[in-house]
Design a protein with these regions (language model features):
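Short, hydrophobic beta-strand segments that form beta-sheet elements in well-ordered domains
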Residues: 23, 40, 97-100
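Short, small/polar residue-rich loop motifs at catalytic or cofactor-binding pockets
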Residues: 35-37
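Short amphipathic alpha-helix that is part of the acyltransferase structural core
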Residues: 1-32, 138-156
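Short, P/G- and charge-enriched loop/turn segments at secondary-structure junctions
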Residues: 29-30, 128-136
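Conserved beta-strand in the GNAT
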Residues: 42, 48-56, 61-68
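Conserved active-site alpha-helix within GNAT-family acetyltransferase domains
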Residues: 92, 96, 102-129
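Conserved acetyl-CoA-binding loop-helix of GNAT-fold acetyltransferases
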Residues: 69, 75-88, 99-100
């Protein structure tokens, strides 16, 4: 069997249902997907969507907004490719850090470290996900994470 090509492409407005379906299958929230101030990507294998990831942009930092690969495509390093492509995009746009909320995952292996919730809420206060939590007077579940980006050296 030949390996099908994998491509990560910028999500378009018509991809919202696809992104939401992939996120829902992974148990992730779909609120604010593809809103203004965000960038999303769809991963395709053989022309079929198998993953999605998003970034919500703040001033000099971004919030990772979902990283999901369909169960049928897991265990092949595709999730790592998605995350690292988002890290590279954030670095290239000049972000000093990427933050995220997570209920699981081995985020240390991606260079993330746990940080207090106040750090994330304070550094990316205008991102859709943070605004939504504040509007509901709700704390995000799980842990809060940060990955510093060495923009000056061109390394993420």
């Amino acid at each position: 069997m030949t390996e099908q090509s994998v491509q990560i492409r910028l999500a378009q407005p018509q991809d919202k249902d696809t992104v939401c379906r992939i996120f829902q299958e992974a148990g992730l929230e779909t609120e604010a997907a593809l809103e203004a101030g965000t960038t999303y990507w769809v991963m395709e294998r053989g022309g079929q969507p198998v993953g999605a990831i998003g970034l919500e942009h703040g001033e000099g930092a971004s919030l990772l907004r979902g990283a999901a690969v369909l169960p049928s495509a897991q265990g092949q390093g595709l999730g790592r490719r998605l995350v690292m492509s988002a890290v590279e995009y954030a670095r290239a746009r000049g972000d000093r850090a990427i933050y995220m909320f997570s209920r699981g995952g081995d985020w240390h292996s991606f260079g993330f470290t746990q940080v207090p919730l106040a750090v994330v809420m304070g550094d990316v206060p205008d991102t859709p996900q943070v605004r939504a939590y504040r509007a509901r007077s709700e704390r995000p579940g799980g842990s809060t994470w940060m990955r510093a980006l060495d923009v000056a050296a061109g390394k993420a």
